[in-house]
């Protein structure tokens, strides 16, 4: 619960940034390809660097150091309000994702230990649900600031500094509260050189292909900005992101409970739903963008809860930090390819039919790989 509150406060800041960054970059004159590239590189760094931070956390047992460094880098989001340079904004977007890479494996390992006996699906689902409260409040607050400041991106982004300071304060209090519990359990668990199972690699490959075929939210919002600009309604873009988070939050909680009953085969549902964002994005006008946001929110809610929960069920605790690192590298690589490919296809006006064919092929491969994954519950 405490880590969920910290994540909630973090989400108020960084999800606000993720909701407005495509809008801001479009306002500064950036192409769809560069927005997709920035999103892709950010996710590749954000997920790929976990391959380093995860094993380092396992071997050094310095979980809290990585957590503090990672949350500290969220300061990149309000700092975006201090510049109107396209390239500097792109760098700050990527820097925030680096922070995500540093904190996430250690945070997930801490959550998996503290929630022992609760059920991995429920634990990660509950954490994500609390998390998403901030993910809704943040973009909504930023949207209201955009209205109040008459679409002033700089002042709106700088208004996030107080939330950042509050988050760091609560993180310190959380550390003081649960450090002893985590350390006591950690001393009973040592890192191991046991190889990760074939089922884990099949599962990671399935997630890779799933993300390759999922249209990035940054480009869905970019399309929204293009539609809304003519009416001077760029302030609406953060509220489109609020729609994503409003769907994401309950879906994370519900899917966590279903996953605990059905198991990994339930992941076939978000894989199939991943086709919908591109279908709806091909529709003309704002309604298509709204439907694409809803569809993306359904997938995201499951991606951020049960995708991680499946790793917990496949991998023993001593290798879990490393496993999250490898798993997230696959997730990041898939998101990078997705951002570049979809951004390019939007810029050169590839036909919606061809884009849909690409998505369907990717999701079929993902489902086939998923069928080869056989999670094995570990007794801890």
What are these regions (language model features)?
Residues 263-307:
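C-terminal transmembrane helical hairpin of 12-TM major facilitator-type secondary transporters
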Residues 1-43, 200-230, 237-240:
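Helix-loop boundary and gating motifs at the non-cytosolic
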Residues 319-348:
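A late C-terminal transmembrane helix in Major Facilitator Superfamily
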Residues 49-61, 146, 251-263, 346-347:
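Helix-to-loop junctions at the C-terminal end of transmembrane segments
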Residues 65-79, 161, 265-280:
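Structural signature of the two symmetry-related core transmembrane helices
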